[in-house]
């Protein structure tokens, strides 16, 4: 009898050890899998499952104290509520469901602690490095935009590069080791060069503005250093602009504008003008609570036939419309002013979370990047990039807790619920 009790009691620590190993592996795996279209969704479900096995749901009351966690829950609840006054589509691409991918932040953050942090960082860096190498090959050797083998568009790849640039600049400023600092600045230049060779104008502008804000905030008290870095950054950007054919793309923008003035909207910029116009018209129709979750996907093609005498009626042949190429118009179409407030609260909470952990400078730069990117595309629907940002945020939070000697969330069998 005594032997059975001893044997049973020894099983619990052993089970917890295996559970910890499983959590480490999943954190490592997720950082790599989030870039793979055929694995990212499954990886998210695996993270959630391991979180439940790790009794993460018992720590939800602690995790929800982070402003970003609360904001994500509010946004997803608002979208779910919006189905009640929307006409749920029987068919369609249902891209709005991608907003719910934000929820993966909760189990990922809850699984992290000081012991598991290196595994999460390893997965994050490994995944980024693998995708970056494939992307550089596609850009420099194959002459392709984006990363076709991984089904990553040039906009997603450009956004990924932009985030890497901002993080590299910040880490270079924080590092006290000359070799590491030099390596990070070299990485920044490499990423910037590749980004200038991508056709994504919006992510590039967001990167330059976000990086500029970061440099200003980081070195504003060191005027000579600030001026030196700013001059070097501008010279580098101009040099890369020439080599990357940016001026040809700017000339294309002017051509698109001229064609739009002639009533020809079947161009990249002209199509966006049309989508924004119809989207703003849709918001004006139902300004308070929008058309309901899911309805805007089919709204464009129905409306263009008669709107403004049908000047956009041929655009469905040019491109199938499933979103409005602007975060604010997109959420406004779904949920109106209510949705706009919720989305603004999300961005504010993202910054507040990073600020609370002494990361206000990179927080301001990243939120600036998200905001600017969302003006020309539905950045919030770029699942891979947004998930990548959330993983960075989670890692940064736990890293800061570790450095400041703060406790992370307790991993006990008995939780608060």
Question: Where do the PLM segments sit?
Answer:
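Alpha-helical transmembrane segments of multi-pass inner-membrane proteins
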Residues: 48, 112-143, 152-219, 241-242, ...
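A membrane-periplasm/extracellular boundary helix in multi-pass inner-membrane enzymes
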Residues: 197, 218-262, 277-285, 293
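Transmembrane signal-anchor hairpin modules in multi-pass inner-membrane enzymes, especially those
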Residues: 1-84, 91, 110-122, 171-182, ...
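Transmembrane alpha-helices of multi-pass inner-membrane enzymes
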Residues: 48-49, 343, 363-375, 379-417
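Perimembrane helix-loop-helix junctions
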Residues: 52-60, 207-229
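Aromatic-anchored transmembrane helix interface
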Residues: 68-76, 89-112, 128, 151-163
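Long extracytoplasmic/lumenal interhelical loops at the membrane interface
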Residues: 264-270, 274-277, 285, 289-335
């Amino acid at each position: 009898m005594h032997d059975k009790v001893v044997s049973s009691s020894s099983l619990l620590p052993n089970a917890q050890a295996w559970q910890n190993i499983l959590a480490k592996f999943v954190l490592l795996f997720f950082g790599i899998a989030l870039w793979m279209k055929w694995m990212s969704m499954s990886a998210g479900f695996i993270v959630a499952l391991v979180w439940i096995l790790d009794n993460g749901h018992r720590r939800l009351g602690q995790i929800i104290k982070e402003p970003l966690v609360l904001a994500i829950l509010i946004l997803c609840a608002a979208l779910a509520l919006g189905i009640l006054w929307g006409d749920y589509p029987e068919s369609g691409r249902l891209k709005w469901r991608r907003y719910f991918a934000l929820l993966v932040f909760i189990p990922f953050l809850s699984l992290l602690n000081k012991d598991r942090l290196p595994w999460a960082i390893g997965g994050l860096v490994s995944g980024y490095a693998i995708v970056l190498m494939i992307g550089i090959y596609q850009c420099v050797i194959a002459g392709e935009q984006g990363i076709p083998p991984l089904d990553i568009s040039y906009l997603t790849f450009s956004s990924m590069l932009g985030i890497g640039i901002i993080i590299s600049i910040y880490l270079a400023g924080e590092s006290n080791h000359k070799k590491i600092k030099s390596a990070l600045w070299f990485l920044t230049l490499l990423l910037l060069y590749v980004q200038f060779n991508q056709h994504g104008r919006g992510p590039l502008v967001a990167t330059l503005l976000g990086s500029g804000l970061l440099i200003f905030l980081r070195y504003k008290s060191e005027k000579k250093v600030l001026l030196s870095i700013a001059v070097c950054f501008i010279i580098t950007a101009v040099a890369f602009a020439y080599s990357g054919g940016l001026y040809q793309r700017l000339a294309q923008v002017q051509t698109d504008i001229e064609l739009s003035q002639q009533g020809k909207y079947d161009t990249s910029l002209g199509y966006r003008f049309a989508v924004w116009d119809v989207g703003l018209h849709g918001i004006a129709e139902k300004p308070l609570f929008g058309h309901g979750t899911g309805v805007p996907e089919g709204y464009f093609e129905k409306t263009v036939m008669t709107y403004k005498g049908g000047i956009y009626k041929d655009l469905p042949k040019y491109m199938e419309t499933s979103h409005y190429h602007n975060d604010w118009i997109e959420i406004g179409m779904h949920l109106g002013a209510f949705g706009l407030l919720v989305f603004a609260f999300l961005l504010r909470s993202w910054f507040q979370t990073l600020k609370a952990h002494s990361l206000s400078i990179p927080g301001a730069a990243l939120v600036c990047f998200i905001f600017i990117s969302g003006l020309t595309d539905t950045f919030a629907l770029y699942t891979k990039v947004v998930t990548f940002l959330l993983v960075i945020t989670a890692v940064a939070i736990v890293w800061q807790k570790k450095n400041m000697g703060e406790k992370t969330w307790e991993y006990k069998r008995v939780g608060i619920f």
